[in-house]
């Protein structure tokens, strides 16, 4: 089987490898006209009588059940908790303290004969209400609050990225499974027709119109066709089971054929510019850059003085020095020398910022490569589909001519086998080319930041989930 690109998508490579393996096992024989009639009739009956499953339904199920989405949602909840934690550092602290103390003896001062002032009772209690508020901490709590807000936005963007990537994975599995099932139908009909040709060859041998070599050749062809059918059927079943596990659906209906997926307009450069603006990864990077810059400022804040205020109301059993009082204390701490700790933390934060800035170059280059690959891949896949369609038509006509020639003795069984082999190859290539064209269209939408499926809006799904 011929690849339509030097580097096709991985799932297409697997499908092509399976097709090549099938071709090495099964060699020849297939009346193309009958194949088209039986395949179309079987597909129509299956989609009419059985339950149909669309790609959109599979994607929605995967988004609702896959653990990667749950992990992304968990990261959002953690980021939300971090926001509350950072906000709490700005708020005041209120504590109520109490204690009950037993002393070995009572201590008192004799003021006059018969009159004493107890300064330490044998049993004493006290309680206080304390309010502490940071007045200035080098703006570090405010920086931390802004960083937590950015991390929350990053977590939400990461979830959107996960959704797009999972959608692309489901689409690849869906199209691969659909192509595998169509390949099974091709091989099934081919096997039936080859078995029919074997019966014809045996009857012709009985009347002396064919040799024993012709019969042996058709018997070998039947054996190869049976083996090819078993192989492709097993591959299709595995692909179907894998798709069911990926999407969280126990029983899949018949996979509804995916219509032409619309692609975004514009040339490669225009689409790359669009991707730089709309890709979730770029939006995430902008937040990471801002957060890294704030982290440098946060670490620099440790050079600045710290000012705290503490208000307290205190009450005790003892009357010494008083049974109750209120106080307000301002505490100022000026860092003089900390062993180079702050300077080292600032240097680390600056390097983190530098790495994020370098990541911008890497990400832009990666996105540009993805868009170029998807853009060129779609053009190649579309051309390959046209070529496969023409090849199928040509193989159909060639088989008809060869079959007529074989009937009148102008062509041998080897010639008929060759023409039917070409028909099988052409139809299999057509199936894979059609699936690859749709996958490349979905990949192109994904590469520029659009939701891969045009009929599924992420915003609606996210709103429904909340």
Task: Map each language-model feature to its residues.
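Bacterial N-terminal signal peptides that target proteins for export
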Residues: 4-32
């Amino acid at each position: 089987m011929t690849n339509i690109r030097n580097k096709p998508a991985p799932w297409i490579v697997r499908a092509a490898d399976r097709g090549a393996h099938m071709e090495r096992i099964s060699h020849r024989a297939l009346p193309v006209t009958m194949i088209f009639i039986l395949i179309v009739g079987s597909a129509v009956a299956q989609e009419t009588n059985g339950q149909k499953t669309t790609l959109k339904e599979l994607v929605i199920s995967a988004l609702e059940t896959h653990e990667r989405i749950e992990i992304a949602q968990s990261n959002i909840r953690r980021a939300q908790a971090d926001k509350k934690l950072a906000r709490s550092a700005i708020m005041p602290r209120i504590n109520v303290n109490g204690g009950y103390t037993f002393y070995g003896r009572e201590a008192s001062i004799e003021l006059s004969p018969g009159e004493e002032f107890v300064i330490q009772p044998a049993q004493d209690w006290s309680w206080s209400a304390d309010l502490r508020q940071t007045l200035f901490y080098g703006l570090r709590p405010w920086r931390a609050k802004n960083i937590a807000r950015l991390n929350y936005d990053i977590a939400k963007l990461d979830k959107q990225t996960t959704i797009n990537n999972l959608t692309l994975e489901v689409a690849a599995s869906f199209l691969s499974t659909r192509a595998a099932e169509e390949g099974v139908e091709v091989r099934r009909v081919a096997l039936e027709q080859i078995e029919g040709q074997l019966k014809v060859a045996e009857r012709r041998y009985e009347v002396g119109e064919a040799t024993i070599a012709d019969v042996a050749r058709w018997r070998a062809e039947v054996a190869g066709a049976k083996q090819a059918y078993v192989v492709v059927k097993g591959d299709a079943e595995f692909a179907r089971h894998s798709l069911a596990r990926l999407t969280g659906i126990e029983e899949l209906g018949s996979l509804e054929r995916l219509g032409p997926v619309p692609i975004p307009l514009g040339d490669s450069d225009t689409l790359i510019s669009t991707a730089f603006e709309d890709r979730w990864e770029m939006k995430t990077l902008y937040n990471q850059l801002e957060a890294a810059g704030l982290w440098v400022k946060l670490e620099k804040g440790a050079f600045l003085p710290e000012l705290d205020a503490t208000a307290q109301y205190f009450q005790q059993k003892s009357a010494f020095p008083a049974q109750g009082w209120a106080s307000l204390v301002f505490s100022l701490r000026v860092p003089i020398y900390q062993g180079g700790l702050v300077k080292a933390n600032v240097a680390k934060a600056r390097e983190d910022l530098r790495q994020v800035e370098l990541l911008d170059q890497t990400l832009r280059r990666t996105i540009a490569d993805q868009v170029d690959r998807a853009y060129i891949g779609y053009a190649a896949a579309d051309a390959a589909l046209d070529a496969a369609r023409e090849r199928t038509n040509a193989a159909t006509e060639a088989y008809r001519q060869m079959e007529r020639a074989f009937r009148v003795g102008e062509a041998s069984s080897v010639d008929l086998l060759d023409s039917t082999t070409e028909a099988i190859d052409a139809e299999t290539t057509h199936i894979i080319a059609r699936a690859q064209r749709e996958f490349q269209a979905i990949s192109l939408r994904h590469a520029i930041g659009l939701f891969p499926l045009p009929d599924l809006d992420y915003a609606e799904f996210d709103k429904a989930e909340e």
